[in-house]
UniProtKB/Swiss-Prot annotation:
GO terms for biological process: cell fate specification; cell-cell signaling involved in cell fate commitment; regulation of root meristem growth. The modification Hydroxyproline is found at P65, P68. The lineage of its organism: Eukaryota, Viridiplantae, Streptophyta, Embryophyta, Tracheophyta. The keyword Nucleus does not apply. Glycans are attached at N34, N54, P68. Belongs to the CLV3/ESR signal peptide family. GO terms for molecular function: receptor serine/threonine kinase binding. Keywords: Developmental protein, Differentiation, Glycoprotein, Hydroxylation, Secreted, Signal. Coiled coil: none annotated. The gene is CLE19. It comes from the Eukaryota. GO terms for cellular component: apoplast. Residues 1-24 form the signal peptide. This is CLAVATA3/ESR (CLE)-related protein 19.
């Protein structure tokens, strides 16, 4: 009984993996046919680099307060 359940589980996982692979391949081929696959990849690289640069710029402008805490003076 356990073997039958394992076989059903294994076959369903194989079917899901095959469907996922075919969906990603078809989407990739659609994007490549339109010529936007490489452009989209470059935009994603630029966006990720831009967000990294922006976050580091914000971190460098942050002011670290030094001196007495006004909340403790109450």
């Amino acid at each position: 009984m356990k073997i039958k359940g394992l076989m059903i589980l294994a076959s369903s996982l194989l079917i899901l993996a095959f469907i996922h692979q075919s969906e990603s391949a078809s989407m990739r081929s659609l994007l490549m046919n339109n010529g936007s696959y490489e452009e989209e990849e470059q935009v994603l690289k630029y966006d990720s680099m831009g967000t990294i640069a922006n976050s580091s710029a914000l971190d460098s402008k942050r002011v670290i307060p030094t001196g007495p805490n006004p909340l403790h003076n109450r």
